[in-house]
Amino acid sequence: MNKYELVLIFKPELSEEDRNTVFSRIQQVIDENGKLEEVHDWGKRKLAYEINYIKEGYYYIVNFDLDPQFVKEIERRCRLFDQIIRYMVVRVDEQ
């Protein structure tokens, strides 16, 4: 298993309950196939640049261990939700 970091940016008009519902669907893949390390809710922040006329969003940073074959499934689920403006999964080097 490798260590990964997932950055999620949710639309600014979403309630905390809606964000948690969407995140739980992504977390399900991690829990079934790996281990969730940390979840950081950075709150509402201004975006570095406008995305589809949206200027701010809710940031989540998620650290987890997962087999590489399941990363595609996480990316697929992130693409399915309109509530997610942007996402990025990166492998973290172990030191």
Curated annotation (Swiss-Prot):
Keyword line: Ribonucleoprotein, Ribosomal protein, RNA-binding, rRNA-binding
The family this protein is said to belong to: Belongs to the bacterial ribosomal protein bS6 family.
PANTHER family in UniProt: MITOCHONDRIAL 28S RIBOSOMAL PROTEIN S6, SMALL RIBOSOMAL SUBUNIT PROTEIN BS6M
Protein name according to UniProt: Small ribosomal subunit protein bS6
Any Gene Ontology CC annotation: cytoplasm
Organism: Finegoldia magna (strain ATCC 29328 / DSM 20472 / WAL 2508) (Peptostreptococcus magnus)
GO biological process: translation
Function: Binds together with bS18 to 16S ribosomal RNA.
HAMAP family referenced in this protein's UniProt entry, alphabetically: Ribosomal_bS6
GO molecular function ontology, one term from the record: small ribosomal subunit rRNA binding
Highest taxon in the source lineage: Bacteria
